[in-house]
Amino acid sequence: MTVPQYIGPNRTGITVIIIGLGIGGLTAAISCHLQGHHVIGFDKLENLEPYGDGLILTPNGSQVLRDLDDTGAIAAWINTWAYNCRDCKIYNTDGVHVGQHPIPDTDKGLSLLPRGGLVQILYQTAKRLGLDLRLGVKINEFVEDVDQARVIIDGVHVQGDCIIFADGANSRGREAVSSCNVKPYYSGFSVYRGRADGAALIKDPQCHWLLSKEGAIDQATGFAGPEMYVQLATCGGGQASFCIGITQRFALQHTQSAENFWTTPIDKNEMLDKISYWKCINQIRPVIDKMAKDQFILCPLLRAGVLDSWVSPIGRIAVIGDAAHPFFPTSAQGAAQAIEDAATLAITLALAGKNNIRLGLKAMEAMRKHRATYIQRNAWRVNDAWFGSPVEERIGEKAAPAIGVIDWITEHCCRTYASNEFDRVQDSIATGQPYVPTNIPSQQFKEAAEWIANRNDEKEKN
């Protein structure tokens, strides 16, 4: 199999407008540019500050990013965060070891890296390539017709061939493409997220159980409580430490909206107070205390029913990433699946051509929808099963709410797949015959198809 070669800028005559310049949006912008499309990108933030904690990036996502930059800068940066931890040891609230979660693919390109740092290097790469990216612009109005798509900013029309919404679960693009499930809902779960500089942990002997001067091998430790799962991990050979604390039965009481939680830090004691009765609190507290004040946040975890389409009826608006399929952090696939969407989109648009934008967008959806839906829903299922289980059963392989590394997910090359499958998808769309993707095993495809078919039965859980 061969990965399609990039053909250089401005060869296709297609102008792609991208709304949202996070990981998915920036990957789409660079991929589209390299496939020959003209790109105009917008983000409401005035500066793409390095907010956020860490994210797992598996090879199905990282290889796409490595190939976006011919200077090797992205690949070199990802390599500095290569993950060499082999397992995550899990303890109960008494500090008793109850199981461990294997991390088997650390030698195949698995990385644990800072989310904000990844956004920064992608943005720098896009600017070096000369992409037209406009920050501090909130898009409130957009239109499409059979000939073009436009965004309207202070009365000024910016015209393109299509609009791609990559602006998260609360995207306005959802209502432009789907007749159902356009509003995400609070899942009943939230996650505390934080980041600490590795040097701060090394200076404190109370943190040496997680990271010391000899910490070239990364560590990951989980603590399983009745209503919260806390995971602390180091990465980059001790460059940084990350925290996630997934909690249920949590009433949203904060003033920050679901749209700005990434940039609204909270008091770390809020999380610590919730686990103050744990016997292992004195082990956890020193590490949490080292988390940067402006990098410790509380994220409501949103769910959304399956959209009946990722593409508008006219065929010039599409959603990708969390705008199409919001993920839980326990999936370890949110970033990688957004990257797969983005890279696939760039290729299918190039293969469809300027005169058939709708085909390009619908082909992307056909290739991606079942795969992304299954990975998303399976992570929700594992999360719910864990939190719904008796505490005494959270041992061994069930000690953590994690799905693990699955080969058919992590070893997939979405670019080769998009290139090889396009003709078959095009024929399916032309004839109306169902397209059965091969980037997902048959049993998982059947489950995803059932979820998609029953999308109108999904109700918000209160």
Curated annotation (Swiss-Prot):
Cofactor list: FAD
Cleavable signal peptide: none
Active-site feature positions: R193
Keywords carried by this UniProt record: FAD, Flavoprotein, Glycoprotein, Membrane, Monooxygenase, Oxidoreductase, Transmembrane, Transmembrane helix
UniProt keyword annotation of Cytoplasm present: no
Effect of disrupting the coding gene: Abolishes the production of both oxepinamide F and oxepinamide E and leads to the accumulation of protuboxepin A.
A Pfam family per the record: FAD_binding_3
Chain segments annotated as transmembrane: 14-34
EC number: 1.-.-.-
Major localisation: membrane
Sugar attachment sites: N10, N60
SUPFAM superfamilies named among the record's database cross-references: FAD/NAD(P)-binding domain
Recorded metabolic or biological pathway in which this protein acts: Secondary metabolite biosynthesis
Membrane topology: Single-pass membrane protein
GO BP annotations, alphabetical order: biosynthetic process
GO molecular function list: FAD binding; monooxygenase activity
Binding site for FAD: D43, R115, D322, A335
GO cellular component: membrane
Top class in the EC scheme: oxidoreductase
Cell compartments where the protein resides: Membrane
Family label: Belongs to the paxM FAD-dependent monooxygenase family.
Function as written in the Swiss-Prot or TrEMBL entry: FAD-dependent monooxygenase; part of the gene cluster that mediates the biosynthesis of oxepinamides, derivatives of anthranilyl-containing tripeptides that share an oxepin ring and a fused pyrimidinone moiety. The nonribosomal peptide synthetase (NRPS) opaA assembles the quinazolinone core with D-Phe incorporation. The first adenylation domain (A1) of opaA loads and activates anthranilic acid whereas the second A domain (A2) is for activating of L-Phe, which is then converted to D-form by the E domain.
Protein name in UniProt: FAD-dependent monooxygenase opaC
Gene name, Swiss-Prot/TrEMBL: opaC
